């Protein structure tokens, strides 16, 4: 099952056997309806909150509305997912949740103040929620990619100069591939040890922890 706002990949997902529901991750009602629909098919074993936005702008060039939009899209939607899906999982006594953070959540990057606040909030929330629900069967983690070759990063990836400059800041000297991030998410949702919770896995080519 997938709740998506952009219907451009609906046919592709449906072809893979995914039940696609159009909705907005910032809408409490949409998430409640989605979770209720999924529960009709059985237990909810795993939830992925895969939401992001591209907002590279210094604070003096960003107004209150733009900042709040970044927080709503990323952090508020994550809380709603945690709250609503978490409640469904608590009634089962088990479940795994993964949230999308970013290297900006733990590393000071130029002009990333808004997204850093949002993703840093997600990481803190994940750690706290992992503690809250550890003895109730829920395992809650996050994945924090660096620059990855996705549609969201197209403003950088489509500019050769910007792409090369970004790559030079990464210890492995290349941007990430979406398949690499997907593999980590799959592991967390299906194969990670039962005692693995409250962790932030950085798929950023070493950027957040390695100096070369």
Residue ranges and their predicted role:
Residues 58-59, 66-71, 166:
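Substrate-binding pocket helix/loop in short-chain dehydrogenase/reductase
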Residues 102:
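Residue(s) in the substrate-gating loop at a strand-loop-helix junction
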């Amino acid at each position: 099952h997938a709740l998506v706002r952009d219907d451009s990949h609906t046919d592709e997902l449906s072809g893979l056997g995914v039940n696609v529901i159009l909705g907005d991750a910032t809408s409490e009602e949409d998430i409640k309806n989605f979770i209720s629909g999924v529960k009709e098919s059985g237990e909810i074993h795993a939830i992925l909150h895969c939401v992001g936005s591209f907002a590279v702008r210094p604070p003096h060039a960003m107004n209150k509305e733009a900042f709040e939009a970044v927080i709503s899209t990323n952090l508020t939607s994550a809380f709603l997912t945690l709250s609503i899906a978490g409640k469904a999982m608590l009634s089962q006594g088990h479940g795994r949740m993964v949230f999308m953070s970013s290297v900006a959540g733990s590393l000071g990057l130029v002009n990333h103040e808004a997204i850093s606040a949002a993703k840093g909030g997600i990481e803190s929330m994940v750690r706290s929620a992992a503690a809250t629900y550890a003895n109730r069967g829920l395992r809650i983690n996050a994945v924090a990619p660096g620059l990855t070759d996705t549609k969201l990063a197209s403003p950088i990836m489509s500019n050769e100069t910007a792409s090369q400059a970004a790559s030079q800041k990464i210890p492995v000297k290349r941007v990430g591939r979406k398949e690499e991030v997907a593999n980590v998410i799959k592991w967390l949702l299906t194969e990670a040890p039962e005692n693995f919770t409250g962790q932030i896995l950085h798929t950023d080519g070493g950027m957040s922890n390695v100096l070369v």
